[in-house]
Curated annotation (Swiss-Prot):
InterPro entries per record: IrrE_HExxH, Rad_response_metalloprotease
Superkingdom of source: Viruses
Record protein name field: Uncharacterized immunity region protein 2
Source organism: Bacillus phage phi105
């Protein structure tokens, strides 16, 4: 497998591919279960879609129960990205109490979610169709505004 070097995006895509290969699923809920992350639906404030929490060797993904199914799946994928890429980062603390920008972490978690929900084999099924990458993203639970995070370097002529 050759992965064009796009810095952290290459590493994120490779991490997602390893997870999918190891557990034979790209379902974020199943993956969370396999790696001992508790997924908890909760009635959160409408501005909070979800969060990842690491506490005393226990891992939790909390998802706003008021979201629709596609949104919940994306949020689970995004938070799974935090669990895999930044397992002990306390982003709420960093955002509130430090000058450290957590934007990089959020983009990386979004990239993880996009690669998980839009693996190359899914995107390649739409080759030679009228569907755009944004269309394919939305059909697979990825917000259109994040479709640009998909690494298409291994897909020829898409």
């Amino acid at each position: 497998m050759t992965i064009k070097n796009r810095g952290p995006y290459t590493l994120i895509k490779a991490a997602v591919q390893r997870l999918i290969k190891k557990y034979k699923t790209s379902n974020p809920y199943e993956l969370a279960s396999y790696i001992n992350i508790n997924v908890i639906p909760w009635n959160l404030h409408h501005e909070i879609m979800g969060f990842y929490k690491y506490d005393k060797r226990n891992k939790y993904i909390v998802i706003n129960s008021n979201l629709n199914q596609a949104e919940r799946t994306f949020v689970c994928s995004h938070e799974l990205g935090h669990a895999q890429l930044h397992p002990r980062a306390n982003t709420p603390f960093m955002k509130e109490r430090t000058l450290f920008s957590v934007d990089k972490y959020e983009v990386e978690a979004n990239t993880f979610a996009v690669e998980l929900l839009l693996p190359d084999w899914v995107v390649s099924q739409y080759k030679n169709t009228e569907f755009t990458l944004d269309d394919i993203a939305v059909m697979n639970g990825v917000p259109a505004e994040l479709a640009h995070l998909k690494d298409l370097s291994e897909l020829k002529n898409f």
